[in-house]
Amino acid sequence: MNTVGTPLLWGGFAVVVAIMLAIDLLLQGRRGAHAMTMKQAAAWSLVWVTLSLLFNAAFWWYLVQTEGRAVADPQALAFLTGYLIEKSLAVDNVFVWLMLFSYFSVPAALQRRVLVYGVLGAIVLRTIMIFTGSWLISQFDWILYIFGAFLLFTGVKMALAHEDESGIGDKPLVRWLRGHLRMTDTIDNEHFFVRKNGLLYATPLMLVLILVELSDVIFAVDSIPAIFAVTTDPFIVLTSNLFAILGLRAMYFLLAGVAERFSMLKYGLAVILVFIGIKMLIVDFYHIPIAVSLGVVFGILVMTFIINAWVNYRHDKQRG
């Protein structure tokens, strides 16, 4: 697997992530089971975005010093594009979490605890998926065509899909988990497991955590191939992906109260997936530069938010 990642870059990335996670977990322990306020969510979102951009700047500077601008510029652009793709696709993941918490009636104060472990699990699972994907691409480059076709299909499916939280309990996976886990009927404070009559029982909070992890894996199947369309370098794919999901918990609490105001977002994300799928399928005929890909993704997001604002304005005017 060809990569610009040196031991210094890998080590620096690991240290930054470890320190930030330690700070986040320490603050979580001090606050206990309290919901993150909108102000705190906005502050943490800004911290994670700023940290990601600073890392990319340091990454670019390091490559300028060691490889030159000809290498540094496209690699830094690849990181930024991958980060933007993952960050935008992660919003749909957040909306699924909202449906899960709503369906299982998880109090806001306990949602934070679930998401702490959910994000930690996502880091481990995505790291495994990215290195596996990088190895497969290095051995079988035709897999990129499969990724492209899959993203094209997923984009169309996303645009046509109708999300309904009322059927979550009837999903085969949920029924299977409930049938195979010894589980209580009610949430017991912040506990994932409780003891009754000497036996260990999972609580519904544990079921929600499992579903949060599985939903992230499902979304990673979309987002990780999307970043491979930009670069196959495992260092850039992993760092851009993990920096994007590290801010997911803060993003969740930032968007939780206004999710219904983003009705058009899934269509914008669907267009992004279709564009990336086409980019992967035509790579042998025409190579779309990274800067163009970044511009297209950013442009689609801007247009989506403009259309969304217009739709919200029309709805508010009709209600008003």
UniProtKB/Swiss-Prot annotation:
Topological domain spans for side Periplasmic: 1-6, 65-89, 135, 220-225, 283-286
Claim: Transcription regulation is one of the keywords in the record: no
Keyword annotations of the record: Cell inner membrane, Cell membrane, Membrane, Transmembrane, Transmembrane helix
Primary localisation category: membrane
This protein's record includes keyword Cell inner membrane: yes
Membrane-spanning intervals of the chain: 7-27, 44-64, 90-110, 114-134, 136-156, 199-219, 226-246, 262-282, 287-307
A Pfam family it matches: TerC
GO cellular component: plasma membrane
Cytoplasmic side: 28-43, 111-113, 157-198, 247-261, 308-320
Protein location: Cell inner membrane
Membrane topology: Multi-pass membrane protein
NCBIfam families: R_switched_Alx (TIGR03718)
Recorded family membership: Belongs to the TerC family.
Function: Has been proposed to be a redox modulator.
Protein name: Putative membrane-bound redox modulator Alx
Organism: Shigella flexneri
Lineage: Bacteria, Pseudomonadati, Pseudomonadota, Gammaproteobacteria, Enterobacterales
